[in-house]
């Protein structure tokens, strides 16, 4: 993917980039993949199980997942990536030449190779999906508290409470999902994770004339 960088931010980003590049070796990549795979390998099935019979289920769609290449040679040049994917069960069906347009009419005629993974899925409206999940969470007894978290209190490196601005919530486990702002919260846990900001994006087309 293309990278757009504000150059005045580069000095601040450099320590993270150095660590990132240090992990860009085959041995380190394999180790990272081994740890990530159990989290994401069955994510489609996990989503289906989570929302089955709830109002969030309507936002899920079964689908294929396709990697697009202009030529078969370009696909072959990506052999290492596919070797790793196949080791974890992601083995593609190749569609070549004019058959690509038959499979996906929305693609440009100069796309001559497509690697297709079966049994995938997508969410038609991320906002609608998480809103429905939030509603299910509350209906099942979940409690929503909107307050500033000041600290994660620990004993022997284990969390025992979440310190809010005006109260303390006793807990055995806590999930920290505040991205780059997690740094200060996890200090007490003696967890050192190199974190940096990344501007993300998501586009939803309303009533598109064509779909994959």
Locate each region found by the language model.
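N-terminal glycine-rich dinucleotide-binding loop that anchors FAD/FMN and/or NAD(P) in oxidoreductases
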Residues: 1-4
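A short coil-to-beta-strand element that immediately follows conserved catalytic motifs
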Residues: 60-62, 145-146, 195-198
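A conserved short coil-to-beta-strand element within the FAD-binding core of flavoproteins
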Residues: 94-104, 122, 143-160
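Central helical "cap/lid" subdomain
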Residues: 153-154, 160-211
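Rossmann-like flavin
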Residues: 11-135
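Conserved FAD-binding catalytic core of PHBH/FMO-like flavoproteins
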Residues: 119, 211-212
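Residue-level detector of anion-binding/catalytic polar loops
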Residues: 91, 143, 192
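Loop-centered beta-sheet repeat module
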Residues: 130-131, 135-136, 142-154, 173, ...
């Amino acid at each position: 993917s293309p990278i757009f960088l504000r150059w005045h931010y580069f000095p601040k980003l450099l320590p993270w980039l150095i660590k990132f590049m240090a992990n860009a070796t085959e041995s380190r990549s394999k180790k990272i993949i081994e740890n990530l795979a159990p989290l994401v390998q069955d994510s489609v099935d996990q989503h289906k199980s989570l929302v089955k019979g709830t109002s969030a289920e309507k936002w899920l769609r079964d689908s294929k997942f396709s990697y697009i290449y202009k030529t078969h040679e370009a696909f072959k040049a990506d052999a290492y990536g596919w070797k790793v994917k196949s080791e974890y069960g992601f083995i593609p069906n190749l569609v070549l030449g004019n058959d690509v347009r038959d499979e996906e009419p929305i693609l440009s005629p100069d796309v001559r190779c497509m690697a297709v993974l079966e049994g995938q899925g997508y969410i038609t409206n991320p906002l609608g999906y998480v809103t429905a999940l939030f509603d299910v969470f509350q209906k099942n007894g979940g409690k929503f508290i909107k307050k500033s978290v000041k600290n994660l209190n620990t004993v022997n490196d284990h969390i025992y409470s979440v310190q809010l601005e005006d109260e303390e919530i006793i807990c055995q486990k806590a999930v920290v999902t505040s991205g780059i702002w997690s740094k200060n919260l996890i200090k007490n846990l003696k967890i050192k994770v190199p974190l940096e900001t990344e501007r993300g994006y998501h586009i939803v087309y309303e009533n598109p004339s064509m779909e994959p």
